[in-house]
Amino acid sequence: MSAKPIKVTITYCAECGYEPQTLEVAGAVMKTFGHEISSITLIPWVDGAFDVRVGDELVHAMERDGGFPKSETVLDAIRAQLAS
């Protein structure tokens, strides 16, 4: 594991059916980083939410950014935290 624990949190609208997008992002993180992150947390929510945090950084918010994030956006945020 990385010396610096990196936590990824995905808050998604369960009632909206956002599970496929959630699993796509989570799968990309797991496949790319595996043991380099300390946890991936999936939080079912409501109100159209789809937010992704890497550590304390909000890297995507559906309300702010619109739509779903590209997996590469999330992976780049993790790379940046690993490099810092």
Where are these regions (language model features)?
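Short, thiol/selenol-centered motifs that function as redox-active sites or metal-ligating centers
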Residues: A3-V29, F33, V46, L82
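Conserved short-loop catalytic and cofactor-binding motifs
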Residues: C13, I40, M62
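A generic structural motif
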Residues: F33-S39
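Short beta-strand
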Residues: T41-W45
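A short acidic, often aromatic-flanked loop/helix-cap motif at beta-alpha or helix-coil junctions
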Residues: G48-D51, G67
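A short, hydrophobic beta-strand/beta-hairpin element that forms part of a small beta-sheet core
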Residues: F50-H60
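Non-catalytic, surface beta->alpha helical segment in thiol-disulfide oxidoreductase systems
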Residues: V59-S84
